Amino acid sequence: NFTDGLDGLASSVTVLVATFFTVVAIGTKSGIEPITCAVVGALLGFLLFNVYPASVFMGDTGSLTLGGIIAVFAIIIRKELLIPILCGIFLVENLSVLMQTFYFKYTKKKYGEGRRIFKMAPLHHHFQKPGNVGIQALIQKPFNVVPESKIVVRFWLIGIILAVITIVTLKMR
């Protein structure tokens, strides 16, 4: 749900994850390949209207359902332990929110005012805000705002890299 903040972000990353499950399911006798292909097809159709500038939005119901579908796919093909690698984008997005919240509350209690690790959480919104905060000086030029479409493409590339790492991990076992 936290990843559904930019046009096409949650659905495009889920296409990568569902495609991975389709490829892996072919080697098993689970019989979920038609379902995984249907999810990929539905998301690709949805992406036509959800990429920047989006005219259709997923909402909480859609994003939470996709999370449940990912979990069910992993359980059916017995690859639950690969979820932290494969779904690393979703994991980092959620961790950024938790880190920001806990750090803000901790610094508010300690210093009387809350401080931030990121300019904004979840992480994808951090790259949309100008200025430097925390580790920002190492990642991005000062006052450099990254366009929404570039952020989504970078997350796609990271998702592809994570899927390849997951396949390599799967083959090493």
Language model features by range: what are they?
Residues 1-173:
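Alpha-helical transmembrane segments
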